[in-house]
Amino acid sequence: MEADLTIELINATVQIEQPSGAGTRIVGAGFLVSAPTPDGRPRTVLVTANHLLEQMPADEARIGWRFAGTDGSWRYAPGPLPIRRNGTPLWTRHPRFDVAVMTIQAPESFARAAIPLAWLADETSFDDWGVGPGDEMMTVGYPLGQSSNRAGFPILRTGRVASYPTTPISQFPTFLLDITVLSGNSGGPVFMAEYGRRRPGTEYPEGAFIAGVLTKQLELEIGVVTHAIYVREAIKLLDGAEVLAKP
């Protein structure tokens, strides 16, 4: 049976939230990436938009875990997500773009659901697959803080690439997606899944990749996507950040 990249990204995406008073909350999305340390130790990395975490004033947010029951049911069980220690951010941000990453301790089922680092597009993926204006992409998130059901799964939405050119990435680090971006979408993955099925005996989906992170809404209600290569770069910065954080 073929594995669907869409389902795998739904399973790897989580809600991030923090109460903001008067019954309101700051809500966004993040997704988990399996990115082993340089010495080969397993590591689960949470990827999201930097502005989402910066908007949260308290040191602790909540992350929306989901757990499967033996009868096919699902249970939504949000848990604590420390994002600062005594006011100092625990996440690492890309120095130029709205991307944030942090190493987290995830439940075993979520550590298994984390997508491989290799699924993130690199600097040649768009050209290799001929991606351009009009191509359909998908994103998952929590628009206006809503989930697809009480189990806390994200909502899937689609849009088309709405800008040109999209490469070279060094000159065009973001691209536009024709989708109405609402509060709660920020930080979610944007991906190509037209050919995103994995054949038995192969490791990765064919012709599918995570194109970037949804990071901004324009006044035209068009989404701004930051290319995934900058997620890769931010993850590389994690090792230095972790060393500096040691007492």
Task: Locate each region found by the language model.
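C-terminal tail/extension regions appended to the core domain(s) of diverse proteins
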Residues: 216-247
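Serine endopeptidase catalytic core focused on the charge-relay Asp
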Residues: 10-14, 18-19, 26-27, 56-174, ...
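A conserved glycine-rich beta-strand in the N-terminal activation segment of trypsin-fold
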Residues: 19-45
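Residue-level recognition of beta-strand microenvironments
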Residues: 33-35, 164, 193, 216
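Short, surface-exposed secondary-structure edge patches
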Residues: 5, 35, 126-130
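Cytochrome P450 catalytic-core helices
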Residues: 48
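Catalytic nucleophile loop of clan PA
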Residues: 176-213
